[in-house]
């Protein structure tokens, strides 16, 4: 839309392939201030036959169009000690109900996510990078679903239903702590080792932490 050197504003559109489990299209307006190294993103996305990357079909189907409005913020800060980055997003989703579904209503769906990342180049060796990050994947902070559960038939053959309402916010909050070290050589090969500690994987409350260690190699050509 405009770019005056220090600041810019752009409008983007994204559409997933129709072969995807959930068809999604999104429209986003972004503003970037290069001096402050700060950016804002405001957008609107629409998912077909589902919401928040979850598919709802058959007896638990929802309508074709389920819009989400979201806002995101990103801030970078470069210092002599390295670079610090913070990213956060908030969203609200309006789920459209299907009259032929056992789901009656899905209301007040509010989501959040955030990430904090610190990186320091040239630790121990040239062309190396040490990275610390804390991440919370997208989580439903609030929302409720009202639905019918079929019971026994009456003598006349009519089916009885019992209506329930359940909160959609999960029992836990997934937070990932990651430490990653990478080094590249002159031939274009990059060696990476990453340690990750996860609390409440999948936003399901757990007594224990999950630990992962991974080593990989990348070659640029």
Where are the regions that the model predicts?
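Outer-membrane beta-barrel "beta-signal"
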Residues: 208-221
């Amino acid at each position: 839309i405009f770019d005056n050197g220090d600041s810019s504003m752009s409008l983007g559109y994204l559409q997933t392939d129709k072969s995807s489990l959930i068809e999604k299209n999104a429209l986003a307006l972004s503003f970037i201030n290069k001096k402050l190294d700060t950016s804002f993103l405001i957008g609107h996305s629409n998912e077909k036959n589902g919401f928040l990357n979850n598919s709802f079909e058959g007896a638990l189907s929802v309508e074709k169009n389920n819009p989400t409005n979201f806002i995101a913020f990103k801030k970078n800060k470069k210092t002599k000690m390295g670079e610090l980055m913070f990213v956060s997003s908030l969203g609200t989703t309006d789920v459209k109900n299907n009259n032929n579904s056992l789901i009656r209503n899905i209301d007040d769906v509010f989501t959040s996510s955030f990430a904090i990342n610190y990186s320091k180049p040239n630790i121990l060796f040239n062309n190396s990078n040490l990275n610390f990050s804390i991440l919370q994947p997208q989580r439903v902070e609030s929302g409720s679903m009202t639905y019918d559960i079929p019971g026994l038939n009456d003598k006349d053959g009519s089916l009885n239903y019992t209506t329930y309402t359940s909160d959609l916010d999960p029992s836990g909050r997934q937070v990932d702590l990651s430490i990653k070290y990478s080094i590249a050589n002159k031939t274009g090969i990059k060696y990476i080792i990453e340690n990750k500690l996860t609390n409440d994987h999948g936003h399901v409350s757990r007594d224990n932490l999950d630990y992962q260690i991974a080593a990989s190699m990348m070659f640029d050509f």
